[in-house]
Regions:
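Intrinsically disordered, low-complexity, charge-biased linker/tail regions
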Residues: 1-3, 8, 15-20, 63-64, ...
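Residue-level recognition of tetratricopeptide repeat
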Residues: 14, 53-54, 88, 122
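Short coil/turn linking the two alpha-helices of tandem helical-hairpin repeats
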Residues: 40, 56-60, 94, 121, ...
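Alpha-helical adaptor scaffolds
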Residues: 18, 23, 30-81
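Alpha-solenoid helical repeat scaffolds
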Residues: 10, 43-50, 81-85, 101, ...
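A generic tandem-repeat structural signature
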Residues: 68-106
Length: 165
């Protein structure tokens, strides 16, 4: 019975996050964690991660929020949503480098995770310049960078191999 109530509280917390109401979500995730046993598996760990995210977004308790999210990632390292939550907390702490690395680790698990892809796009990291010893705004780097981007946007052609007789 309490497991079902914990799941309902968890779902309401996710809905509150979707609305941007992190303070309400904080209460739902706290209730979910209280109703689940300490060894409640991945559901309890996810509740802890989302609680950390809400703590970072609704209050100024950023170190505690980051500790919770990092503990969740350590407990269940195969869940990309936990990496997204940790990355968002790192962004709130203005630690863009750690947020970037966290998003990339999450994308290794699921390369098409929409939240992680959007977070990386929003973060806006640049690629390395093509010719490293020249300044980024050097004409050679600008031309080669444009060429590299155009080649990567272009769909690849599949070459036909002759059928063996």
């Amino acid at each position: 019975m309490s497991t079902r109530r914990a799941e309902r509280a968890f779902e309401k917390g996710l809905q509150s996050i979707a609305r941007g109401d992190f303070l309400a979500a904080l209460g739902f995730f706290e209730a979910s964690m209280a109703l689940l046993p300490a060894n409640g598996g991945t559901h309890a760990v996810a509740a802890m991660s989302y609680y950390g995210l809400c703590l970072a977004c609704a209050t100024d308790r950023l170190p505690e929020a980051r500790d919770l999210c990092e503990a969740a990632v350590e407990a269940v390292p195969e869940d990309p949503d936990l990496y997204l939550n940790l990355g968002r907390v790192c962004e709130r702490q203005e630690d863009r480098e750690h947020a970037f690395r966290t998003y990339v680790r999450g994308l290794r698990l699921n390369p098409r995770h929409p939240g992680l892809v959007e977070a990386l796009r929003r973060l806006g990291f640049r690629r390395r310049s093509v010719v490293g010893f020249l300044p980024r705004d050097h004409a050679v780097n600008r031309v080669l960078g444009s060429l590299r981007a155009a080649l990567q946007r272009r769909p690849r052609r599949r070459t036909r191999r002759p059928k063996a007789a």
